[in-house]
């Protein structure tokens, strides 16, 4: 009995490490092209900024549009098969970009890469929800999530050093990324357990009738819908920061190149300890999880507003640091843990895919809308205020829905 218990503990720890490394690999790809856009433009006969920017748009379009289908397939076929299939497509897409001699092939590669990545979120967090002890779940999700910050740093710094300082061809950077993805594919194959035949048979049997668990926890319950919307609002502010903060600091706050990079990286770097601390706090006081979420969201909204209202550079840096510490990176693992508690075990993959679909939709909306507002008004400040208002709105809706459900539960219990 002790051996079984030990094996189980070992497996959930392996999952946490492997899924964190998966995020590292994905975010290396996410950010590796951004610093070397000028080199890519030069190799393609100086195509326009809009055409270069569309590379990321194609990726996120495929990533978002495949979230829900991948969630359904994860529930049906299991995480291992979907991770292997997804990363295989991801590798092919990355190699297409590396070997491309024109913009069309790069767009096709971006679509394939985005589609391949789409299976990771629902696979990773349904695996952690199914295997990690509930008392450690939010902390485990925070460790998994921290891989994105590490990957972002490696991608931004690595491509800059290799291409700009060491004069490596930008295509070779993509070959390096593809090699990293191949390694991760091998790791998934060796570490992740496949879906047992007994589980498949049981799942097939369960499709004939709707379980009582699913009746109590539909994917579009009022509570889950409020979480989906809150996550959209949370991610809107984050992707506004990721996309437009460097430009805002340079054009409207007078930062120079080195300071821009430091300030932008600060948001991601300080997010890791914030996520680990608050997820541990959430695990320790599980009954107060909603209060932790509400507190973090309100402070994050205030910091988004203070970013543009700060009268000097010192206050601006304090606002950015606190946003990184208390914003999306901190609340992500707690929200993920909350979703895992509200959705039924059978539909975890679909629940997480819906959750991430709404969040990543903001990555498509926020950059474009901010650019439009900037063109019309000549400033990006109003966009930061809008993002803060969105976070407050999402938080209030979530608070009202959770309070209503709590009172309804108390009435039923006392009846």
Ranges and model annotations:
Residues 109-150:
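Cytoplasmic helix-loop-helix junction between adjacent transmembrane helices
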Residues 65-103:
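Conserved MFS/SLC helix-loop-helix module at the cytosolic interface between two early adjacent transmembrane helices
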Residues 340-379:
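A late C-terminal transmembrane helix in Major Facilitator Superfamily
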Residues 288-335:
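C-terminal transmembrane helical hairpin of 12-TM major facilitator-type secondary transporters
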